[in-house]
Amino acid sequence: MAIINMSELDLQGKRVLIREDLNVPVSDGVVTSDARLRAALPTIKLALEKGAAVMVMSHLGRPTEGEFNAEFSLQPVVNYLTKALECPVRLANDYLDGVEANVGELVVFENVRFNVGEKKNDEALAKKLAALCDVYVMDAFGTAHRAQASTHGVGLHAPVACAGPLLAGELEALGKAMDNPARPLVAIVGGSKVSTKLTVLESLSGIVDQLVVGGGIANTFIAAAGHEVGKSLYEANLIEEAKRLVANAQSRGGDIPVPTDVVVAGEFSPTASATLKDVSEVTSDDMIFDIGPDSAEALSEILKNAGTIVWNGPVGVFEFDQFGEGTKRIAQAIAESDAFSIAGGGDTLAAVDKYDIADKVSYISTGGGAFLEFLEGKELPAVAMLESRGE
């Protein structure tokens, strides 16, 4: 990939515009989870250290384009960055027709989604953004799968377009896991529906040695294996699809193992009592919310012997502790494995935090949708743009 990396450039005195993913949860004007901000800080600090006049832009939430809405303002992010950085930080509301940016300070543009044409990748808007800088830095892997004015169009028109260290690191880690992985390659795909992750399952079943499915997705595979799933969340219309994916994996010497024991309850609630059952004993009234200890142990063994692990999605309703043991055991197995491991997606990162294994996972991806699209083998528009500008 012929992508220019920001770290290689001389930025002294240059106007540098960085697109970060600062889309963080905010409550009562305070940032409640700062993971994305912490991930973005090294890039911002590096640009400041290199003597640039640094401007940063991001979206936050889903406001109506063209309308200012205080609920989606980046002011709470500015407050956070002011404490995290040793330089002045200010919010710029009107910046499209020019903005003053000085070396030694950080200018944060107000929510890019307040601009009409952002989502449609409007060329006039992209050109206005490009005119504000000497160097455009795309560092937001979480939005690399969207061709929008601030993630794609601006890069086509800026004098120089490059990847920031965070984005470059994501691409390197994902490339290591997917392009030339140490074998066996094991992927864990959890989540509620097969339909939302069908293309990922399709793509992975053709390249991985073991594909572990969890959550509601696993229920469809349990049904496909001929077992009762009761009132569990599953997709009857995708049973044939599940059978085909299993056959596809097995034809390559791989497999999609189905749980042998499961944890069930009669209702979905934080106080529901958990019952352990053999998968053949599930009744029509049961709802499956987790894998049982035997299944978790078997999966742990697979993970222990893996060369590469890609994790996207929990294997149970881990938010409720009584249905979290399966995900906890998987998390521990990944932490104990010598494999190169990469974890991505919101629920997965919440599980990584809950079971405190962040420092034991080789790479934690900041992307949700972008992470999935990379696993599907899709071209990410922002990455394609950077490649075209790097040639």
Curated annotation (Swiss-Prot):
Its main location: cytoplasm. It catalyses: (2R)-3-phosphoglycerate + ATP = (2R)-3-phospho-glyceroyl phosphate + ADP. GO terms for cellular component: cytosol. The keyword Kinase applies. Monomer. GO terms for molecular function: ADP binding; ATP binding; phosphoglycerate kinase activity. Keywords: ATP-binding, Cytoplasm, Glycolysis, Kinase, Nucleotide-binding, Transferase. It is found in: Cytoplasm. Substrate binds at residues 21-23, 36, 59-62, 113, 146. ATP binds at residues 197, 319, 345-348. GO terms for biological process: gluconeogenesis; glycolytic process. Its EC number is 2.7.2.3. It comes from Shewanella sediminis (strain HAW-EB3). This is Phosphoglycerate kinase. The keyword Nucleotide-binding applies. Pathway: Carbohydrate degradation; glycolysis; pyruvate from D-glyceraldehyde 3-phosphate: step 2/5. InterPro entries: Phosphoglycerate_kinase (IPR001576), Phosphoglycerate_kinase_CS (IPR015911), Phosphoglycerate_kinase_N (IPR015824), Phosphoglycerate_kinase_sf (IPR036043). Disulfide bonds: none annotated. Belongs to the phosphoglycerate kinase family.
